Amino acid sequence: MINELGEISTSGGVLLKMWEVIVQSGSRPLVRHSHIRFEITLITAGSGIYTVGDKKYAIKPYEIFVFASNEQHCVTEVGKDGLKMINLHFEPRYLWGRSFDRLSNVNTNFCFQHSPNFENCIPADRARQIRGLFTSAAEEFSKKEQRNEVQLCLLNMIIVALIRDFGYFDGALSAPTDKNRIIRKATEYIDMHFQENLTLETLAGLSGLTPNYFSSLFSKVSGIKLWDYINSRRIEAAMQLLKNESNLNIIEIASKCGFNNTANFNKAFKKTVGITPGEYRLSDNIII
């Protein structure tokens, strides 16, 4: 069961979203679940197993889990008492292009990769500060008159705690470079136009760079390959349509998400999610 707590949207789409998830006990299939959005999860009750890449974490109440963009994670086991959690997702562009705080100067790849020594699970006894901020954000979303600046301020404090107290990020809070700005502009363009027939030449041309140099720069600055980023955006959109738009067939969904044929769509979807679009549409499990 999913209970939407609230979201903050801009003209470019949903910026931040928070919801509560309740999952019944039992084993769950391993799905290569990942997304561009940065994720922070609070376990409020129950137990289970989180599979993150090659690691497995025993889930316990009041723990915090943190997942970078495109980091594969999946709950593969839920204990006999079920599992209850609150998820917070925010887009990388939340950190980009703002002038009112130093978080806008975090390296572009903050959301895409963390320190190699960072553990995805923050134990309950070390998570008190983040848990308190997280709970306050959920309470703000539950109010009838939401004040977006409050939720965003709380998120800022959570990010600062991850950097300062838990060694999430090795990078420095330095001023953005021209290269950072180029890649930020490119990702914003992709986010708005991923449904279209994007080409390397088009994206490179927006920045006045050669295709080879632009492709290399995108990977270096963002920490993710250009076409992996584009396909992730397209697959995320396809997953939403597969679950929420039963009137659309798979060919129509592929077209709406920027794939020029179903063969490419099926291949990209299975590579990302681990199952075919048809299997995903028929599955009853909430992928978390």
Model-derived segments and their meaning:
Residues 125, 141-157, 177:
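All-alpha amphipathic helical-bundle segments outside canonical DNA-binding/catalytic cores
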Residues 34-50, 66:
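Short, conserved beta-strand element in jelly-roll/cupin
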Residues 161-167, 185, 189-193, 197-233, ...:
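Basic/polar phosphate-binding segments, predominantly the helix-turn-helix DNA-binding elements
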Residues 130, 134-138, 155-163, 179, ...:
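Hydrophobic alpha-helical core bundles mediating ligand binding, dimerization, or RNAP-core interactions
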Residues 1-24, 72-141, 164-169:
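A hydrophobic/aromatic-rich effector-binding and dimerization subdomain
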Residues 44, 131-142, 187, 191-194, ...:
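Regular secondary-structure segments
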Residues 54-68:
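Short acidic-glycine-tyrosine-enriched beta hairpin
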